[in-house]
Amino acid sequence: PLTFEDVMNVIDLEQPEGVIVALGGQTAIGLASLLSQAGVRIFGSSSGSIELAEDRQLFEKAMEEIQIPMPKGKGVFDVASALAVAKEITYPVLVRPSFVLGGRMMHLVYDEESLKQKVEEALHLDSRYPVLIDKYILGQECEVDAICDGSDVFIPGIMEHIERTGVHSGDSMSVYPPYSLKDEVIATIVEQTRKIGLKLQMIGLYNIQFIIDANKQVYVIEVNPRSSRTVPFLAKATGLPIANLATKVMLGYSLKQLGYVGLYPNRKRWYVKSPTFSFSKISGMDVVLSPEMKSTGEAIGYDYSLNRALYKSLRASGVRVSNYGTVLATIADADKQAALPLIKRFYDLGFNIEATKGTALFLKENGIKTRIKKKISEGSDEILESIKKGYVTYVINTASERDSLMDGKIIRRAAIDNNVAVFTCLDTVLVLLNVLEEMTMRISLIDEE
């Protein structure tokens, strides 16, 4: 691991004029304060600016001063305070420790019992820092990578996530340029990005994640005062040398000198980033998407057609895309109405539909011919046998009730072990269907402009 002592040993040996921490991820910027105290010059955002972005109370105060909305929430140091905050802002809430990477131990909870358990786990991880309790807002998520020189801001691009809030940004499919955001929402995001960069006195790269709710209200989830994992994707999509530009800014160049200010114009092609997972190599790991990041890589697909770009990205990430076969559906009660039109589209495409009893009866009531499969918890292994023998093309599983969690986990694991595509988020299923309905098209070559 990157430690202060190791870095200081290199600095003592090399005697550099200064160091850049913003390109080294969360661990690197975590060393900024110690390095500054040791007299090391930090190129880019100062340790004070980094702290302003990272410290919950300081950041909330800064956002309030520039009138930028955030989801309601608070940091707590005990379970009783967590329960009080959750009662005030109402469930569901997001629970996460401070200063963690990849959404580690971040959970979406719906009741007091789950909240107690998750807060205790987070406090056990590190009781020196508060556990953050935030109101969960269901909405469209997007993120921005930007460069600030202290006076101006340059935004290479805005990326819109396929999956709605509740899935970690690193596990979401991401599209550039945005495919559904209205002009007024984009204008708000650009203005908020500018105001945040100047308020926090960012020098170089920073990343902001936003939520857009059903009323088109834009909220800031968090600001990362560093280069994000999305920079390589955005650099590829825009053709801009983003890291190079940011480094020049950190070394003292102004954005106006470099000729880049404001929002960079969108390119004509669509670029889609899909996460890649290593579930088949990590035995026992659950594949369900959640606020905690599980992906280990990413793939890109691009084309002048959005659906073709989505197809290429899915295929590049290892998803077997087939326009015939059998869909196995086990859907939570809360998701049944949203899943119905999606399952209907599979049925209309000619897929066989199989489901556990509750889901099957619901689908039959709505005119979809469905074969009932017994649950594993009922002592049957017919679902597992069907998956193992290659009869199932796709598994759609959104089960979240406690009594069906174990069934769902076993089904998801069996699918992964037998190279069957698993979808735990209906937003991703919608993308797959859009692709399947265009499967007869000729896929264009990945060419250069």
What do these predicted regions represent?
Residues Q337-V435:
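Feature captures the catalytic cores and cofactor-binding loops of soluble hydro-lyases/lyases
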Residues V21-L23, I42-S45, K72-G75, V95, ...:
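General beta-strand structural signal in soluble alpha/beta enzymes
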Residues P1-T3, K74-D78, L108-D111, G301, ...:
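Short acidic-hydrophobic, aromatic-tinged amphipathic segments that line or gate anion-handling sites
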Residues E17-E54, P69-K74, F346, D417-V429:
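A short, GP-enriched loop/loop-strand-helix hinge that lies immediately N-terminal to
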Residues D78, L289, M293-R308, K312-R315, ...:
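C-terminal accessory/binding modules appended to enzymatic or scaffolding proteins
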Residues P1-G18, Q26-I29, R41-G44, I66, ...:
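ATP-dependent carboxylate activation and anion-phosphoryl transfer catalytic cores
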Residues P1-F4, N9-S36, I331, I376-S377, ...:
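N-terminal glycine-rich "phosphate-gripper" loop used for MgATP/nucleotide binding
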Residues S36, S45-M106, N366-K375, D427-M441:
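A conserved helix-loop-beta module that forms one wall/lid of the active-site cleft
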